Amino acid sequence: MGGSADLSKALIEIATPESRSPRQVVCYELANERLLQEALASNHPVDQWSLIKSNSDAYGHTLGQHESYDMRVAQGPLLIAWWIGLILLLLPLLLYRVVASIWLGSMLLLSLGIRKIEGIRTTSKTPQPRVDDLHSADCLLGFPMAPWQWSLAASGLRRLHAPIVWLFGLLLNAVALRPHRKKASAFFASRCLLDGAGHLDSDARFWVSARAALVDKQIGFGSYNQHRPIFRCDSLLRKLLASPYWSLNQYASLFNPIQRIEIAIGDSGLCQQSQWLRIGATALVLDWVEQTDDPNTIQLKSVSEATREFARDWMLIRSVPDRFGTDFRAREISRVYLRSIKSWLDKRPDAPREAWEIIELWQMTLNQIDSIPKNQGQPPMLLVGRIDWISKLWLIQQLDENTVWSVKKKIDIRYHELSDQGYYQQLLDKLQLSPLITDREIDKAMRVPPSDSPAWRRGNLIRELSDAQSSLVVGWESASYELEGQAYVARFLR
């Protein structure tokens, strides 16, 4: 497991270890929630502090969950085109690294010069604690820099690598993930039906999914240019621009046909059924895309527009056109994919048992969604406590029609509270539903990483070297450490 925290924004991000099955992912997600709850309870009064597994913050930023899958970037002629594109990018990449090194060096000299001048001015005075020390300033190569200097350095780098990012974006759009975009985009447009967490906007309108409602591209970069693509390729961009500048190892890894790609349209939910359907159905669709040549797929006229439409359609009545003018509703699209994958699995005698369990759960969920009363006034009660957006909508609909927005918004927020007082947990206690993941599985996941994944090797390395004077630095793909003056690098292959 990994994580990060920005205490200035009260934001904690936590990640599951690499896993081999959808059930395993959900199990470690639930283990993460319990670990956070235990950490909070042991350090802060539970009546004064709480954790919210939210999809937005007080500043209006949309958060949600990012899922990472190993996908084949391209194959056949498209893979050759991908390689050629990467080779053509090498010269501008090297030029960028040279110019960027000069730029960072000049920023470092500027910082040292300013500090030297300030030091001369204060030699005749009694030394006073400085504000721009390591506790309040960022560092470049270990040297402290004032915030304005760091901002200037970062702004310059962004302008220097902007042409490379633009060229790499063209390569992605032209070559990368073509089968996935063609055959799976309609599924992702409708997926919020299964895994949306619900959202109440500032006008008291209820959305199925906050994250999916902001999708504006099929493929691209998210953090770099503030786009909200379905296929988020920021990890590839980081490899292209990765430091240290004298090494091309990360660049060379882009030639591998299998890359880690993020799907960035999912909400942060709590229902086990929602989470298992999200990961399980997505994994099946991606495998189906890469292993079949089925031409009978839905190709929507505008994928991003359809995704936004379905994300705001809690009554499940909106339809969107495909390229041939045929209209589809979200539940109809989901059924088409369900039938296609079920037919594909029928031809595979080696299909794992979990695949069929996901198919059964998927089909049951769609059948229960279809049981919505004709007046469209209430969500299906059978899915309350099992699908997040339906559960939250049901809670809000129990209020009087004249209830003020702030009371409804309180339900929207406290539904995600990770405590016994959270509204989801209270709902679960009331309904007494049988969990899909047992407490025994979750307890084990809190202590032991998956035995057949890089997380196992990473965890063993941390345990062995955490007490030694090894200067251990651990990342997702590799770790570096020193023993008896000898430097070592361990790589965690997936």
Which ranges hold each PLM region?
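Long intrinsically disordered, low-complexity regions that are acidic and Ser/Thr-rich
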Residues: 76-177
